[in-house]
UniProtKB/Swiss-Prot annotation:
Protein name per UniProt: 3-dehydroquinate dehydratase
Subunit structure and binding partners: Homododecamer.
Keyword Acyltransferase: no
HAMAP family given in the database record: AroQ
Binding positions for substrate per the UniProt entry: N73, H79, D86, L100, S101, R110
UniProt catalytic activity: 3-dehydroquinate = 3-dehydroshikimate + H2O
Cited function: Catalyzes a trans-dehydration via an enolate intermediate.
EC number: 4.2.1.10
Matches recorded under Pfam families: DHquinase_II
Keyword Amino-acid biosynthesis: yes
Length: 147
């Protein structure tokens, strides 16, 4: 099973950007641990980060013929991007929305998601563990849908 992991804007700054909120792990450290977890679960991951909405949309569209599911931390695009929502709906792949911080304990504008109502699940607030929980959930979802 192949899973695309998408990291949105500013996630390339993990480790140095507001470590009290997002933790000290870098994105490359999170991706490396996620790859190890995926191997243990029998999944293959492709990880991609961009600060550009169109690049994320391109990856989602490409995933339609190459992937079985998507994990997405769209960052600020979660609250603004109809384009990412439309791309996710167009490819018809299951996806999990995730966030490092608890978006519901933050500013009001972060409480709204353009993705959550179409996601298989939403995980937030556990720091880097949010990624690992999202992967576990996606693998379980894909396995149960194959029965």
């Amino acid at each position: 099973m192949r899973i695309l992991v998408l990291h949105g804007p500013n996630l390339n700054l993990l480790g140095s950007r507001e470590p009290g909120l997002y933790g000290r792990d870098t994105l490359s450290e999170i991706d490396a641990e996620l790859q190890q977890q995926a191997e243990r679960l029998g999944a293959e991951l492709v990880c991609f980060q961009s600060n550009h909405e169109g690049a994320l949309v391109d990856q989602i569209q490409q995933a339609a013929s190459e992937m079985d599911g998507i994990l997405i931390n769209a960052g600020a695009f979660t609250h603004t991007s109809v384009a990412i929502r439309d791309a996710l709906l167009a490819v018809k792949l299951p996806f999990v929305e995730l966030h490092l911080s608890n978006v519901h304990a933050r500013e009001e504008f972060r409480h709204s998601s353009y993705l959550a109502d179409k996601a298989v699940g939403v995980i937030c607030g556990f720091g880097p563990i949010s990624y690992y929980l999202a992967l576990e959930g996606m693998v379980a979802h894909l396995r149960s849908s194959q029965l």
